[in-house]
């Protein structure tokens, strides 16, 4: 008996427990209603849809007639009979979805008590069911503020630069030639502003080339520009100026003066006409004696060059005339037109024909 008294509870305790179970059953009937309630764990997410949990009653259809849809529990009475630890900052209203019954507002389950861990009525019968919507809302981390670039000063606003051209290659305010990254310079930038940027490619050494080729020191026209100014101009402009200075220095002219043009044909000294025709009324002179002999044949009528073709008695004073005549018999035409298939036996005939193609 002593062991039974220590194990079994008293009759008064069992009586109180029976009333407690009846109250739990009534609470479950009220809680599991056919209405759709918004039991979201926290404030609605602006980027996503609101969470709605539809709880359907598991009571048999016979008990629906006994329930009064107009009755509702008094929240003050419920909080008085079943106190619980209320977490601060969770006072929110839970509105029933529109249905056939009247619309009423109740306190959310978070304001009725901490059902998951605090002492309350719902801990026992509802503790076995895992409802994520009854848990306390977890604090949401603050959203990162959008990045706002600092306002630029009025003088530092970037300006659109024109595309690269040969005429502006390496000039101040333009772009470096043959470069993937454009480094524009301000129009009023002082000398040496771009000296920190390395050369994108080695500049052609025109000055050294002229020194090695001619064996002379390249003279400088005027004063020497400072290195910072050369870096600001860019490699293309520096190389061009050095090359122009070297060429002008070798010619003894200023950089702006073009060197005089030289003819490719060298004029040979003119031969003196030492051979003069002695026929009366003819004073022609020739540099060669053979030319004078051919000319005298026109006065004397001598024709030493006769045609050897059978049946041809033509005779000529010059050998080249006999050669052209002989081509008439053979049909040889060495002078061909490059624009058409025609050919000629004489060069002067080909020259006249080429004028027709012009």
Curated annotation (Swiss-Prot):
Superkingdom as given in the UniProt entry: Eukaryota
A Pfam family of this chain: zf-C2H2
Keywords, sorted A to Z: Acetylation, Activator, DNA-binding, Isopeptide bond, Metal-binding, Methylation, Nucleus, Phosphoprotein, Repeat, Transcription, Transcription regulation, Ubl conjugation, Zinc, Zinc-finger
Short motif (9aaTAD): ranges: 71-79
Name of the gene this protein is made from: Klf1
SMART domains membership: ZnF_C2H2
Effect of residue 23 to A: Greatly reduced transactivation activity
Complexes and interactors: Interacts with CBP and EP300; the interactions enhance the transactivation activity. Interacts with PCAF; the interaction does not acetylate EKLF and inhibits its transactivation activity. Interacts with CDH4; the interaction is SUMO-dependent and leads to transcriptional repression.
Record PTM text: Acetylated; can be acetylated on both Lys-270 and Lys-288. Acetylation on Lys-270 (by CBP) appears to be the major site affecting EKLF transactivation activity. Sumoylated; sumoylation, promoted by PIAS1, leads to repression of megakaryocyte differentiation. Also promotes the interaction with the CDH4 subunit of the NuRD repression complex.
GO biological process, one term: positive regulation of gene expression
Modified positions (N6-acetyllysine) in chain numbering: 270, 284
Function description: Transcription regulator of erythrocyte development. Binds to the CACCC box in the beta-globin gene promoter and activates transcription. Probably serves as a general switch factor for erythroid development. When sumoylated, acts as a transcriptional repressor by promoting interaction with CDH2/MI2beta and also represses megakaryocytic differentiation.
Main localisation: nucleus
ZnF segments: C2H2-type: 275-299, 305-329, 335-357
Gene Ontology MF term list: DNA binding; DNA-binding transcription activator activity, RNA polymerase II-specific; DNA-binding transcription factor activity; DNA-binding transcription factor binding; protein domain specific binding; RNA polymerase II cis-regulatory region sequence-specific DNA binding; zinc ion binding
Omega-N-methylarginine sites (modified residues): 178
Glycyl lysine isopeptide (Lys-Gly) (interchain with G-Cter in SUMO) crosslink site(s): 56
GO cellular component, one term: nucleus
Originating species: Mus musculus (Mouse)
Entry remark concerning the domains of this protein: The 9aaTAD motif is a transactivation domain present in a large number of yeast and animal transcription factors.
Residues modified to Phosphothreonine: 23
Impact after mutating residue 270 to A/R: No effect on DNA binding. Transactivation activity reduced by 50%. Loss of superactivation by CBP of EP300
Protein name: Krueppel-like factor 1
UniProt-listed InterPro entries: EKLF_TAD1, EKLF_TAD2, Znf_C2H2_sf, Znf_C2H2_type
Coiled coil feature spans: none
PROSITE patterns in the cross-refs: ZINC_FINGER_C2H2_1, ZINC_FINGER_C2H2_2
Location(s), subcellular: Nucleus
Family assignment from sequence similarity: Belongs to the krueppel C2H2-type zinc-finger protein family.
